[in-house]
Amino acid sequence: MNEDQVSLENQTNPVSPEASDVPAVTPEESPQPTDAVLGEPSGEQSEDPRIGAATETEGGPLEQEKSSEEIIAILQKDLASHRQELAEQSEQLDSIKKRYVALAAEFDNFRKRTQREKEEQAKLIKGRTITELLPVVDNFERARTQIKPNSDGENQIHKSYQGVYKNLVDSLKGLGVAPMRPEGKPFDPKYHEAMLREPTAEYPEDTVIEELVRGYLLDDIVLRHSMVKVAVAPEEGAEVVNGEAGANP
């Protein structure tokens, strides 16, 4: 090797002064890795306590069986609790249903009672109004029986107010008003008012012989009682002449 090549190598690989002072180490003198550094067990070494704890935690078949029994017991307890809660809620629901049915029935009765009272009140008001018109009807009836027209003019007037009377009676019928017809019927204080009593053998005792003032009904309500003459049995020893009792001579 010539000097030019050595000079070129020195320029290519310069060596620092510090590196030149470090002594070279031979392979025999380099440190070798020990077993402890490589992670291999050296001699007798104690087992890791965490591994033992994990093993104890996992347990054997007996411990697993006990754990399953505990879970089943807890689930059964929860199931019994839910069943008890369901039974209580079912009882509460039945109680609410019963109260609802009772309340619905009470409300229905209240509605019917209110409707009935309303109808009765309306009928009562209507009856009072119609009662005020009954004397007018009586006057028309008396005029019809007592007035006898003698001329064509009087007859025309008579027909005119009798036409008014007919219209009035038809209107009352349309409102549900009906006259009583008590003749020949047993006396009933609910509908009749006895004005006269006549001894007679022609009718049974307490039979209505004649209606003196006509009575009227509004459906089943008495607007005015019928004023009547009632038959009574003749006294013993009394002679009945033309339906009237008289003393024997």
From Swiss-Prot:
Q: Where is the composition biased (Polar residues)?
A: 1-15
Which terms in the GO cellular component ontology are assigned? cytoplasm
What's a single GO BP term from this record? Answer: protein folding
Q: Which UniProt keywords apply?
A: Chaperone, Cytoplasm, Stress response
Molecular function terms from GO: adenyl-nucleotide exchange factor activity; protein homodimerization activity; protein-folding chaperone binding; unfolded protein binding
User: What are the subcellular locations of this protein?
Assistant: Cytoplasm
Residues covered by region (Disordered): 1-68
| Keyword Transport in record | no
Note one Pfam family from the annotation: GrpE
Gene3D superfamilies according to UniProt: 3.90.20.20, Head domain of nucleotide exchange factor GrpE
Q: Which PANTHER family match?
A: GRPE PROTEIN, GRPE PROTEIN HOMOLOG, MITOCHONDRIAL
What job does this protein perform? Participates actively in the response to hyperosmotic and heat shock by preventing the aggregation of stress-denatured proteins, in association with DnaK and GrpE. It is the nucleotide exchange factor for DnaK and may function as a thermosensor. Unfolded proteins bind initially to DnaJ; upon interaction with the DnaJ-bound protein, DnaK hydrolyzes its bound ATP, resulting in the formation of a stable complex. GrpE releases ADP from DnaK; ATP binding to DnaK triggers the release of the substrate protein, thus completing the reaction cycle.
- Quaternary structure annotation from Swiss-Prot or TrEMBL: Homodimer.
Family statement:
Belongs to the GrpE family.
Q: Which NCBIfam families match?
A: PRK14143.1 (NF010741)
* Protein name listed in UniProt: Protein GrpE
Which lineage?
Answer: Bacteria, Bacillati, Cyanobacteriota, Cyanophyceae, Synechococcales
